[in-house]
């Protein structure tokens, strides 16, 4: 019966994790360039099969009867499917068609800078004429430098990432891509940062000016999934309440016999 409590408890933890992911997706359904996340679950038999095949620690022998029932919360993942484009007619609003990210220079509260990557191309010019994000982070060129433009001249962003003013090429956007997106992790609202093992590759994305890539979250699908997760959570909760009631009855019966 205690195993039943543990099984229901792990089920609640799993559903809570899925609920957190879904609510975050819904909260960012209107965030430009946001990529939805998903949650995975490992069943007991999958975990058992993994440990049976794992020979890294031969002294860790599990004898008959020492079963750990329940569900194991797996890793969360990001769905990098491209979102729909929305027309803005603002030349500094950029969208990427294909795989790739804009490179930006992020500065933390301590003043330390680092390169982050984003699909959010809602850029502006600051007072100095630098191309920056809506939060003021510098957009980087192909050489990792800030992009300074003349606000008095017409600016054209070409599909290959080059920037021209009055017909003269003045800079080129840094469009980065990676061989395996599993080595990218969320940072803040719309940034991604590579982790150890991430490798760069040539990006094949095209730049479209006057458009913004919307979130790839489908609100209806997320709501339906959230309802299902909520019901599963409540089911596990009722199992725990039932077992708790049964244990309480058993304890009272033992007192009567005493």
Residue ranges, per PLM feature:
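Amphipathic alpha-helical polymerization modules
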Residues: 1-257
């Amino acid at each position: 019966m205690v195993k039943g409590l543990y099984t229901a408890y792990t089920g609640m933890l799993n559903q809570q994790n899925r609920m957190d992911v879904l609510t975050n997706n819904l909260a960012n359904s209107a965030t430009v360039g946001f990529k939805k996340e998903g949650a995975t679950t490992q069943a007991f038999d999958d975990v058992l099969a993994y440990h049976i095949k794992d020979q890294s620690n031969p002294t860790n022998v599990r004898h008959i009867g020492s079963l750990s029932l329940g569900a194991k919360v797996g890793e969360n993942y990001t769905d990098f499917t491209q979102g729909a484009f929305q027309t803005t007619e603002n030349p500094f609003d950029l969208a990427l068609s294909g795989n790739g990210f804009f490179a930006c220079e992020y500065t933390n509260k301590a003043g330390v800078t680092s390169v982050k990557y984003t699909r959010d191309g809602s850029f502006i010019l600051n007072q100095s004429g630098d191309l920056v994000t809506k939060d003021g982070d510098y957009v980087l060129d192909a050489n990792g430098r800030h992009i300074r433009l003349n606000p008095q001249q017409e600016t054209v962003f070409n599909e290959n990432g080059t920037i021209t003013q009055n017909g003269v090429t003045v800079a080129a956007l840094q469009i980065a891509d990676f061989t395996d997106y599993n080595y990218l992790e969320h940072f803040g609202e719309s940034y991604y940062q590579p982790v150890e093992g991430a490798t760069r590759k040539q990006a094949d994305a095209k730049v479209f000016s006057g458009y913004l890539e919307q979130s790839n979250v489908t609100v209806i699908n997320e709501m339906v999934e959230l309802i299902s997760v909520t019901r599963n959570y409540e089911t596990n909760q009722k199992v725990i309440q039932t077992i708790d009631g049964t244990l309480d009855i058993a304890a009272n019966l033992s007192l009567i016999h005493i």
